[in-house]
C-alpha cells in the first residue's frame, strides 16, 4: 500500500519525527529514522522499514494514531526546528539538535 506524506515535524533534540500520512485513512505516525519524509513524498512499508525513492530505509515506528487536527496542531506548535522562519543566514540555532544532517539544509551555528 502506498502512503502519501502530508506534513512532517522533527524534534531534533531526541531524533523523533512525526508525520501525517494518507492512503485510505489519514494517520499520524511517530518514528525514528535517518530518513526524512518530506511532504508529498510517497512510500510503502517493508519488513525492515520503508521504501522511499526506490531505497529501503530502516525506520522504527513508535506509534500510529488516527489523525486528529487538535493533536497535530499541538505537535506542530511544539516544534523545535526553525523551518518556518525567514532564516536569511541559513543557520540553525538549536544547540540541542542531534541530527547529523539537517533535512532543511540549515548549518549548525558554532557555539
UniProtKB/Swiss-Prot annotation:
Q: Which InterPro entries match?
A: Anti-adapter_IraM, PmrD_sf
Chief place of localization = cytoplasm
Gene Ontology biological process: cellular response to starvation
User: Which subcellular locations apply to this protein?
Assistant: Cytoplasm
Name which cysteines form disulfide bonds.
none
**TM segments?**
none
Alphabetically sorted, this entry's keywords are: Cytoplasm, Stress response
Keyword Transmembrane helix in the entry? The reply is no
Is Cytoplasm one of the keywords UniProt gives this record?
yes
State a GO cellular component annotated for this protein. cytoplasm
Family assignment?
Belongs to the IraM/RssC family.
The record, for NCBIfam families, names:
PRK09919.1 (NF007393)
Question: What does the UniProt function comment say about this protein?
Answer: Inhibits RpoS proteolysis by regulating RssB activity, thereby increasing the stability of the sigma stress factor RpoS during magnesium starvation.
Q: What is this protein called?
A: Anti-adapter protein IraM
> Which gene holds the coding sequence for this protein?
iraM
